[in-house]
């Protein structure tokens, strides 16, 4: 069967090839993927089971249940000061669907998107798959692997349409400081760009603060915030992501997804509703555990010759 020409050069990423290789190995400690080793809390699982017993076994609203989107709004206002309304939230099949739909909603053929490196490799394929052109923006150790305005100015062109910013970052772990984010925000407004702000690790900042980009002056109307419950609530297998952004973008993403997934599974959404409203103490407990582990690994690595 002949494949579409646009997919002829599509190849598994290095990360996918590595996962495929270790499937055949024994005794491998996989430190590569951002997945908590904690299981989902039993009361969250029970919330999903109760939803099934209560009859939430039919097609969901395409944008997501209204009460679940309200819970997303409450969570982000409570934790990060981002005020939004349910009409500005889209419930997705994981945060990866958010970025794919967002690029589909915002890019015209040939539009360029600045991708700050190091970054999550699938972003490049998502931009290309939606007709855009990914433009890598390298960062340096001396700037803490955070993008500077000078880095962005070297990469921007008249065809640049947007910026994808990931803070806290996968894979470097860097968190862009507030002052640097303010400079980036000014640059974005100067060039009239949209920002896809991947903040999926917002709950796992061990020192300093996480600043939600959309809360900065002038950024609310041009920022699409990506989030989800995979990292914060140990629910990677549930595939629960969401976007927060301008209503017109949420509507367009919803229309695109109508011919793809036709909504996010109902039981997962009801589990998310419960989790977002009840698990703040658990988030703090797990973050403390992860912080201890991080410190132990850093101490061990720093004691090794040739590793810095």
Which residues are covered by each model-predicted region?
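N-terminal small-domain helix-loop-helix segment of the aminotransferase-like
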Residues: 5-94, 101, 275-278
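Helix C-cap/helix->beta junction micro-motif
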Residues: 25, 130, 190-191, 304
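Short acidic capping loops at alpha-helix termini that bridge into adjacent secondary structure
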Residues: 83-89, 109-112, 159, 220-223
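Conserved PLP-anchoring active-site segment centered on the Schiff-base-forming lysine
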Residues: 105-127
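A short helix->loop->beta-strand "cap" motif at the edges of active sites that frequently abuts
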Residues: 111, 132, 190-194, 219-221
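A short helix-loop-beta submotif of the ANL/AMP-binding
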Residues: 129-135
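Active-site phosphate-binding strand-loop segment of PLP-dependent enzymes
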Residues: 135, 140-207
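Conserved core segment of the aminotransferase class I/II
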Residues: 216, 221-291, 295-302
